[in-house]
Amino acid sequence: MKKIHPSAVIEEGAQLGDDVVIEAYAYVGKDTKIGNDVVIKQGARILSDTTIGDHSRVFSYAIVGDIPQDISYKEEQKSGVVIGKNATIREFATINSGTAKGDGFTRIGDNAFIMAYCHIAHDCLLGNNIILANNATLAGHVELGDFTVVGGLTPIHQFVKVGEGCMIAGASALSQDIVPFCLAEGNRASIRSLNLVGIRRRFDKDEVDRLSRAFKTLFRQGDLKENAKNLLENQESENVKKMCHFILETKRGIPVYRGKNNA
């Protein structure tokens, strides 16, 4: 059963799922789609053409789906935000809608955990199981692969791609692409090691060992792209292939490796 506070504003055309809770002074715009068992807390604003998946939580004063901070944007353009299931969007987070430079939509996968004061700009593409710590800031068109963690107070430059399973340390600043399964740190960020904590949670020991050997082959000597080409030959690990293809396809370049002894 829906629970909607009398002071909440629900615009005509909004589609609300079963068991939705909308608290005092919240706003839900026209043409929104709110899934089942979604809670929109006091003062949160869900703007037009936003979709939020089942079992999600939008906390007080978060703003989802407002127009992009892009001077070329025209308000008559169709744009919005699509968020998957089980999302947590904490207080004062802002998620802007997309632009015609993308497909019109900012997209976030399932199980996102977006902490307070984070900003996700227009046309960002976030995979599943993403964590953004407080005040992480993503500029336009940033892409984050599945299982990526971005530490607090970290800005990411527009068009940067962060591969699957990465960890970006807090108070870093990214301006180049980060290879899957790596840990990056610093201002400007460099690649420091494998994200061993993350890959040990997901993969068995044999796969962790394969990724460790691949990391050493790629980063510790010679030319990075040549190393990636050579490593792809007769490569059986799909995860190692992801690392190699990412390196070969980067457009913003890969930051330098400044290693840690535990890589």
Curated annotation (Swiss-Prot):
Recorded metabolic or biological pathway in which this protein acts: Glycolipid biosynthesis; lipid IV(A) biosynthesis; lipid IV(A) from (3R)-3-hydroxytetradecanoyl-[acyl-carrier-protein] and UDP-N-acetyl-alpha-D-glucosamine: step 1/6
Places the protein is found: Cytoplasm
GO process annotations (BP): lipid A biosynthetic process
Reactions catalysed: a (3R)-hydroxyacyl-[ACP] + UDP-N-acetyl-alpha-D-glucosamine = a UDP-3-O-[(3R)-3-hydroxyacyl]-N-acetyl-alpha-D-glucosamine + holo-[ACP]
Keyword Cytoplasm: yes
Enzymatic class: transferase
InterPro entries: Acetyltransf_C (IPR029098), Acetyltransf_C_sf (IPR037157), Hexapep (IPR001451), Hexapep_transf_CS (IPR018357), Lipid_A_LpxA (IPR010137), Trimer_LpxA-like_sf (IPR011004)
Family matches, as Pfam families: Acetyltransf_11, Hexapep
UniProt-listed Enzyme Commission number(s): 2.3.1.129
Major subcellular site: cytoplasm
Keywords, in A-Z order: Acyltransferase, Cytoplasm, Lipid A biosynthesis, Lipid biosynthesis, Lipid metabolism, Repeat, Transferase
Family: Belongs to the transferase hexapeptide repeat family. LpxA subfamily.
UniProt subunit comment: Homotrimer.
Name of the protein in question: Acyl-[acyl-carrier-protein]--UDP-N-acetylglucosamine O-acyltransferase
Native species: Campylobacter jejuni subsp. jejuni serotype O:6 (strain 81116 / NCTC 11828)
Lineage, opening ranks: Bacteria, Pseudomonadati, Campylobacterota, Epsilonproteobacteria, Campylobacterales
The encoding gene: lpxA
